Amino acid sequence: MEKDLTKGNPLGLILRFAIPMFIGNCFQQLYNMVDTVIVGRFVGDRALAAVGSVGTIFFLVVGASNGMAIGFTILTSQRFGAGDADGTRRSVANGILLSACTALVMSLISLSLMRPLLAAMHTPAEILGDAYAYISVICGGLACTLFYNLMASLLRAVGNSRVPLYFLIFSSCLNVGLDLTFILCFHLGTRGAALATVLSQGVSALLCIIYIYGKVPVLRPEASMFRPDPAFSREQLRSALPMALIYAITASGTIIMQSAVNLFGAVAVAGYTAASKIHMLLTQGYFSLGQAMSAYAGQNFGGGDFARIRKGVGAAVLILAAYTVLSFTLSNTLLPVLLPFFFDPGTDLSLFSGWAETYIRINTAFYIFLGTIFVFRSVIQGVGRAGTALAVGFAELTGRIFMARASMRAGSYRMAASADGAAWLCGALTALFLYFLVMRGLEKGAGEKKGDQSAWQDPDRDRN
């Protein structure tokens, strides 16, 4: 069911819209975590380190494709908010064509550059083969990931966050079954874990397509619309490319951070990998809130209601503050509970726990800044200023590179673990500044336009 985010109480609307996405994103992280857990327990701690060592590349490739998919649907959200059904359907058709081209190009480029990149990241020799086997399958199956993200984003653009959740839950369960089948029955190791992820996301994409064509007519383009539209392409790429670049910029910094962690050896990489999976689970609330704010801002921008956007931001800040307290509390209980699941029962956890605890404890202190980035950057993107939001990514990159390089010089894992926090602090300050700058410019422009229209409609006003 489509949801109009231009009417009703912003706090309640954003919460009801974000919660299904939060559950879905948690499931997505859980089935990524299941890959890691099954690999660690049934293949070994070296295989666990191998999967973890390419986590930043996974984020780069999959994150960039996700950014493209979300960017393609910002125009859909705006057209839907403006009540333009024909424009909504045309944006869907053009987004599908652009996504197909994106998947092909990104798969070819990533596969051709993978081995040199792994070498440049100082990937330990004993895990290099397993690392390449895993990430090459992920990159080769990028079309499945991109089209799932596109279809789910299209549904969210019209206010439907529940259906993608249902399909994702099914896909998560399928992923677990395929993981066990490929690893235990066919002995495919890390390659099998990646194959399970790709196939599961492909099933989710297919289910979303079937649902859209059967139940959501506003997103169902006519066959004649599947022709490249230069005007729509320019508008969609103007949003999508900066969003993909934001992921790429962020991932570039995390690749440098991963390179710093790799210098401490396979044991440190395994401990860091387990901690980073728990961290990703804890931070899904921020990511989901950002997704909700992008759709909320997009619809209200399409409707021309800037005051309502500001009210929504105020509501999002309240949600952000409450979730930060919750995630900080959970971090102290989840780590000792979940850490043993990543390793074989006979493994001496004391070898890995110190590395994991250091990363989690440092980063939870900076979660408030991470949440700030997601809220304010998403609003900037939702109002069609994705290019401006690139500055947030560059600020994060600067903070992350500075701290990662400092850790390499000092030989300090604690400094390497602080690189994310430094990035979030820099990014949050930049996002806040840009939000106020963008909103002031939009409101000023809207006021001037309204004044011009009033003058045109009242030619006798100067006589009085």
Region spans (language model):
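Short alpha-helical transmembrane segments in multi-pass integral membrane proteins
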Residues: 1-18, 76-141, 185-241, 297-365, ...
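N-terminal transmembrane alpha-helices
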Residues: 5-43, 56-71, 75, 100-107, ...
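Transmembrane helical elements of multi-pass membrane transporters/channels
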Residues: 16-35, 137, 148, 171, ...
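Transmembrane alpha-helix boundary and packing residues in multipass membrane permease domains
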Residues: 21, 25, 37, 74, ...
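Helix-terminus/linker motif at the lipid-water interface of multi-pass membrane proteins
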Residues: 30-48, 118-125, 181-188, 248-281, ...
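Interfacial/gating helices of multi-pass transporter permease domains
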Residues: 39-59, 125-130, 190-191, 232-239, ...
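Small-residue-rich hydrophobic transmembrane alpha-helices
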Residues: 48-108, 145-164, 271-335, 370-392, ...
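Short runs within selected transmembrane alpha-helices of multi-pass transporters and secretion channels
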Residues: 69, 138-156, 164-172, 193-206, ...
